[in-house]
Amino acid sequence: MTYRVKEIFHTLQGEGMRAGRAAVFCRFSGCNLWTGWAQDRPAAVCPFCDTDFVGTDGPGGGVFEDAATLAAAILAAFPYKTGEGYRPYVVFTGGEPALQLDRPLIDILHAHGCEVAIETNGTVRLPEGIDWVTVSPKAGTRLAVTSGDELKLVWPQQGICPESYESLAFTYLLMQPRDGLGDAGRGDAESEAVRWCLAHPRWRLCLQTHKYLGIP
């Protein structure tokens, strides 16, 4: 299988229950909910998307002809050797990573001692073997992934009721204030998310700490 990757980079996980953990991110190009082009944003399922996933021109990005080649590029992004008392953490994101992530790539990374995570919109079935699953549902879509480690809901999001996800088999329910609204809009989103979490204690507030820190 050929993989199209926007970028590969080493940073700290900024979101969710594993925030603060060092990881290599592999951002796949392409998504099934938006083309990524500005002129198509009004028709996108998630017009608030804040990610550039178009093309293969980012740092470490490119077209990789097979799983072994892509795995080698991911492993090379770690500034330390694998097997030094730490299990390397690889996060596949996008775009929509489930369109490209497959079992051969997962198996190679596992063979090198890596832990494999995915950040997905949940509309595409996942391959087996993923160690940590984060689903971020979008209004108007049907979930193909109804269980996992964390469900991360961007809020506010028109057309979604957070309580409708509480019966699904996720260990953690997270509410992430919507960005892309400007500083004032983000503040309002944070206030709404705080109010929801205070009134619904199954939910935890999830901030995008990497944006506050100014890291990728």
UniProtKB/Swiss-Prot annotation:
Xref: InterPro entries = 7-CO-7-deazaguanine_synth-like, Aldolase_TIM, QueE_Cx14CxxC, rSAM
Q: Which residues make up the binding site for [4Fe-4S] cluster?
A: C31, C46, C49
Q: How is the cofactor bound?
A: Binds 1 [4Fe-4S] cluster. The cluster is coordinated with 3 cysteines and an exchangeable S-adenosyl-L-methionine.
Q: Where is the signal peptide?
A: none
- First-level EC class: lyase
The record's Gene Ontology biological-process terms are:
queuosine biosynthetic process
- Which pathway does it operate in? Purine metabolism; 7-cyano-7-deazaguanine biosynthesis
Keyword annotations for this protein, in alphabetical order, are: 4Fe-4S, Iron, Iron-sulfur, Lyase, Magnesium, Metal-binding, Queuosine biosynthesis, S-adenosyl-L-methionine
The Enzyme Commission number assigned here is 4.3.99.3
Cofactor(s) this protein cannot do without: [4Fe-4S] cluster; S-adenosyl-L-methionine; Mg(2+)
| Residues that, per the record, bind Mg(2+) | T51
Domain Radical SAM core span(s) in chain numbering: 18-216
Residues involved in substrate binding: L12, Q13, G14, R27, T93, P216
According to the UniProt entry, its GO molecular function terms are: 4 iron, 4 sulfur cluster binding; carbon-nitrogen lyase activity; magnesium ion binding; S-adenosyl-L-methionine binding
Q: Which residues bind S-adenosyl-L-methionine?
A: G95, S136, P137, K138, Q176, P177, R178, D179
Q: What is the annotated role of this protein in its UniProt record?
A: Catalyzes the complex heterocyclic radical-mediated conversion of 6-carboxy-5,6,7,8-tetrahydropterin (CPH4) to 7-carboxy-7-deazaguanine (CDG), a step common to the biosynthetic pathways of all 7-deazapurine-containing compounds.
The record describes its quaternary structure and partners as: Homodimer.
Q: Which NCBIfam families match?
A: queE_Cx14CxxC (TIGR04508)
**Which family is this sequence assigned to?**
Belongs to the radical SAM superfamily. 7-carboxy-7-deazaguanine synthase family.
This protein is called what?
A: 7-carboxy-7-deazaguanine synthase
Species the sequence originates in: Nitratidesulfovibrio vulgaris (strain ATCC 29579 / DSM 644 / CCUG 34227 / NCIMB 8303 / VKM B-1760 / Hildenborough)
Q: Which gene does this sequence derive from? A: queE
